[in-house]
Curated annotation (Swiss-Prot):
Database matches in SUPFAM superfamilies: SRF-like
Provenance organism: Oryza sativa subsp. japonica (Rice)
Molecular function terms from GO: DNA-binding transcription factor activity, RNA polymerase II-specific; protein dimerization activity; RNA polymerase II cis-regulatory region sequence-specific DNA binding
Gene3D superfamilies associated with the record: Transcription factor, MADS-box
InterPro entries registered for this protein in UniProt: MADS-box/MEF2_TF, MEF2-like_N, TF_Kbox, TF_MADSbox, TF_MADSbox_sf
Name of the protein in its database record: MADS-box transcription factor 18
Function, in words: Probable transcription factor that may promote floral transition phase and differentiation program of the vegetative shoot.
Record region (Disordered): 184-249
Amino acid sequence: MGRGPVQLRRIENKINRQVTFSKRRNGLLKKAHEISVLCDADVALIVFSTKGKLYEFSSHSSMEGILERYQRYSFDERAVLEPNTEDQENWGDEYGILKSKLDALQKSQRQLLGEQLDTLTIKELQQLEHQLEYSLKHIRSKKNQLLFESISELQKKEKSLKNQNNVLQKLMETEKEKNNAIINTNREEQNGATPSTSSPTPVTAPDPIPTTNNSQSQPRGSGESEAQPSPAQAGNSKLPPWMLRTSHT
């Protein structure tokens, strides 16, 4: 038969109680050391005997470091799990204040839109009227300011466009002058290469063809100048020889 569960209760015998405490204490310290080494855990063990004697073990360099870490963790844990009741009460009061302010603002907005005016007195209506006039004046002032700024910006753009237009116009005039200069230069070069107009070269008549006419082969008399050919002979100089022989016969 297996053993049943051991019932834990206080040892009445003082000596047995001290012996058991000593054994269990050493075993507990040993187990704490083993878990700190095997599992790389931070372990802190504090034991007080019945006589108030302190026995402790710390895997950290100091027991105080582990205790401070424990206190920080415990405080943060309590802050999350146990919210402050005073803060809750303050939140409730603040919610009521904010809600009343919101209701007042919504009511004022509706009155500015001309709604829910039945409950207002004459004085309240006058105040509302002054408020609307002030708002309208402020709106008009802001509108005029924006219009002036817009006009000023447009004037600046207009001035900039005019300057750009002037620059482009000057560039076009410069290019036009360059083109005209190139055209004039080309014309002058063409005129210089063309020969000047001169009188036509006279066409010389070919030399007369010699004939077998006996009259032309006779010697001239001494002292007699050579006779000039008649116009008919000059004209006949261009005729073929056989025509010349026929004419002389």
